[in-house]
From Swiss-Prot:
Family: Belongs to the universal ribosomal protein uS4 family.
Its biological purpose: One of the primary rRNA binding proteins, it binds directly to 16S rRNA where it nucleates assembly of the body of the 30S subunit. With S5 and S12 plays an important role in translational accuracy.
Name the record gives this protein: Small ribosomal subunit protein uS4
Keyword Ribosomal protein: yes
Species of origin: Chlamydia caviae (strain ATCC VR-813 / DSM 19441 / 03DC25 / GPIC) (Chlamydophila caviae)
GO cellular component terms, semicolon-separated: small ribosomal subunit
GO biological process: ribosomal small subunit biogenesis; translation
Gene behind the chain: rpsD
SUPFAM superfamilies, alphabetized: Alpha-L RNA-binding motif
Gene Ontology MF terms: rRNA binding; structural constituent of ribosome
Subunit structure: Part of the 30S ribosomal subunit. Contacts protein S5. The interaction surface between S4 and S5 is involved in control of translational fidelity.
PROSITE patterns, per the entry: S4 (PS50889)
Region (Disordered): 23-46
Record bears the keyword Zinc: no
């Protein structure tokens, strides 16, 4: 499965936030956006703002691909309910993101690797598809051998219990977590490393799908 392999520090500097949770904050050394004219801020057009919000959303979930963004929007556009909430939920409830939220990985990229390398179980069965969509009641756990990984143990030890979303439960001792309920939009937005106007992203995609 394709994944982003580009410079992550440049992305963080572009949005002015350590969005990938790196231990060495790239903004401490270079707080301004990348590029020759990084310190100059130009006024963006409406189209430019839409593009920026879209890129911010993609970055928040580990640089998801454009086609994944479009696919998620198509899946919810004709459903009853809040399109922005259902659209955002498509990314929040991805398996790789749930592994990250539950504290089994320090970063979203580490979570992606855990899933892709076959370390993760869903309801007791191996799932190596990062975009697998979790529904309420589904349990996420790690294989017996995978629980001994130093990166996993360190991540769980350093996990702040207070930062665990209310729609997730985690049993550290058994390396297991569960999605309790479908998260509300404001709950999801509270977990994002930087603010994203999801309605603007949906408006952008509505003209291109």
């Amino acid at each position: 499965m394709a994944r982003y392999c580009g410079p992550k520090n440049r992305i963080a500097r572009r949005f002015g936030a350590n969005i990938f949770g790196r231990s060495r904050n790239p903004l401490l050394k270079k707080p301004h956006p990348p590029g020759q004219h990084g310190m100059q801020r130009k006024k963006k057009s409406d189209y430019g703002l839409q593009l920026e919000e879209k890129q911010k959303l993609k970055a928040c979930y580990g640089m998801i691909l454009e086609k994944q963004l479009v696919k998620a929007f198509k899946e919810v556009i004709n459903k009853q309910g809040s399109v922005t909430k259902m659209f955002l939920e498509r990314f929040e409830c991805r398996l790789d993101n749930m592994v990250y939220r539950m504290g089994f990985a320090k970063t979203i990229f580490a979570a992606q690797q855990l899933v892709s390398h076959g370390h993760v179980l869903v309801n007791g069965k191996k799932v190596d598809r990062r975009s697998f969509f979790l529904r309420p009641g589904m349990q996420v756990s790690l294989k017996e051998k995978s629980r001994k990984l130093q990166s996993v143990q360190e991540s769980l030890e350093n996990r702040d219990e207070g930062s665990l979303p209310s729609y997730i439960s985690v049993d550290k001792g058994n390396f297991k977590g569960e999605l309790l309920v479908s998260p509300e939009q404001d709950q999801i937005e509270a977990q994002l490393p930087l603010p994203v106007d999801v309605s603007v992203v949906c408006e952008f995609l509505s003209h291109r799908t």
